[in-house]
Amino acid sequence: GXFGKAFXSVSNFAKKHKTA
Protein backbone atom coordinates (compact mmCIF):
# COMPACT_ATOMS: atom_id res chain seq x y z
CA GLY A 1 0.00 0.00 0.00
CA UNK A 2 0.96 3.64 0.32
CA PHE A 3 2.58 3.01 3.64
CA GLY A 4 5.20 0.77 2.02
CA LYS A 5 5.96 3.53 -0.47
CA ALA A 6 6.37 6.11 2.28
CA PHE A 7 8.67 3.75 4.20
CA UNK A 8 10.91 3.37 1.25
CA SER A 9 10.98 7.06 0.75
CA VAL A 10 11.99 7.59 4.37
CA SER A 11 14.61 4.86 4.14
CA ASN A 12 16.08 6.46 1.02
CA PHE A 13 16.08 9.88 2.68
CA ALA A 14 17.96 8.52 5.71
CA LYS A 15 20.49 6.84 3.42
CA LYS A 16 21.06 10.04 1.44
CA HIS A 17 21.60 12.11 4.58
CA LYS A 18 23.26 9.22 6.48
CA THR A 19 20.79 9.67 9.34
CA ALA A 20 20.13 6.59 11.50
Curated annotation (Swiss-Prot):
Entry's Gene Ontology BP terms: defense response to bacterium
Record keyword Secreted present: yes
Keywords, comma-separated and alphabetical: Antibiotic, Antimicrobial, Secreted
Protein role: Bactericidal against several Gram-positive and Gram-negative bacteria.
Record's subcellular location: Secreted
Free-text tissue specificity from the UniProt record: Hemocytes and pharyngeal tissues.
GO cellular component: a single term: extracellular region
Source taxon at top rank: Eukaryota
UniProt key word Ligase: no
Protein's UniProt name: Styelin-A
